Amino acid sequence: MTRYRSRANGRLVAALALGTAALTTLSACGAAPEEDTSSAATATSAADLGGLKELVAAAEKEGTLNAIALPPDWANYGEVIKAFEARYKVKVSVENPDASSSDEISAVKSRKGQKRAPDVLDLGIAFARSGAAEKLFAPYKVEAWDSIPDSQKEKDGLWFNDYGGYVSIGCDAARIKTCPETFADLLKPEYKGKVALNGNPTKAGSAFGGVYAASLANKGSFGDIQPGIDFFGKLKKSGNFIPVESTPATVEKGETPISIDWDYLNAGYADQFKGKGVDWKVAVPSDGVYAQYYSQAINKEAPHPAAARLWMEFLYSAEGQNLWLKGYARPVLLPSMTTEGTADKSFVTKLPAVEGTPTFPTSEELDKANADLAENWDKAVS
């Protein structure tokens, strides 16, 4: 079973009305592509190439899209890729599916000018912002640009949010008599040796979100993540928190029967484990409601610039957004699609229930939280 990647740090309408917001270095050999892609490489919209039809033709001429860090079981990316390949004559090559956002940025830098450089990126919001500041991305506005809330995109199209989710608590009811539903519940002695995060919060976005949510549940704030760090320190001292990165494999084996992760990943577990002896339940803790989006960006020096832009158009079409929705992720266009009647209601009704309305940290608050985690996390849980 494929592991859910621990996406590095970066982001929903009661069914979602939100719109306000907030490897190691890879190396490879290979020459830059020979074909003339200058027109596509400078296109800031499909209109710059004459329209979507012309963009499709240019992308199919390239024939390849280089992607990185897209596990098939993360937000339904496996089906997204299959649908894209079925619609267009473009083969999607995904390298290192379990890579983090930092690995993606490293690949952009280390493979500059090479055929194997990533064309497109799916990043934690902090990395999207820093990558834009480093001038690594190409500006591009998809046809659905105006439907993306201003707070969910960089004004020139250097990055734009794609899908998001809430921090949730997943629990194997086949192994746990009473599943926890709040962060406060996790401190109960009955959960000794059973609570895990999906990764290290200093590197992984889902784990980072878990600590942020725990902070909000313990009188912290976006400007003060320390209560969340202290919470996990207390959880570790009690023996409840275990230093094991939760994955589908560890869940199935019973090694991590309680996992703090994005709701779309935990909800995906529930589907995957049906008939396998795992009764996976998902709860979004009411005492620590925290939501986060990931972001799309195009490598400024993408070896397949037309395919990269066509990929973005597909992701932000109703088909692409509904495929993410099918994977329990909340697409950024869901509010407008709900209004237009293009959101698949059968998928919307399956989203985990949420109480309260989430808010989002500022860039400065995210930077401070990351710095505080880097300085204090290891000390708290060692």
Regions found by a protein language model. Give the residues of each.
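Periplasmic-binding protein-like
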Residues: G164-S168, I229-K234, N240, G275-K300
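Mature extracytoplasmic/periplasmic domains
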Residues: Y290, Y294, I298-P358
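Extracytoplasmic ligand-binding site segments that recognize negatively charged/polar headgroups
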Residues: N66-I81, V94-K109, K115-E255
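Extracellular/periplasmic bilobal clamshell ligand-binding domains
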Residues: E340-S382
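Short, polar/charged alpha-helical segment
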Residues: G51-T64, L70-K91
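Sec-dependent bacterial lipoprotein signal peptides
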Residues: M1-S27
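Bacterial lipoprotein signal-peptidase II cleavage site
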Residues: L26-S39
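A ligand-binding cleft/hinge motif common to bilobed small-molecule-binding domains
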Residues: A128-S130, E252, I258-V278
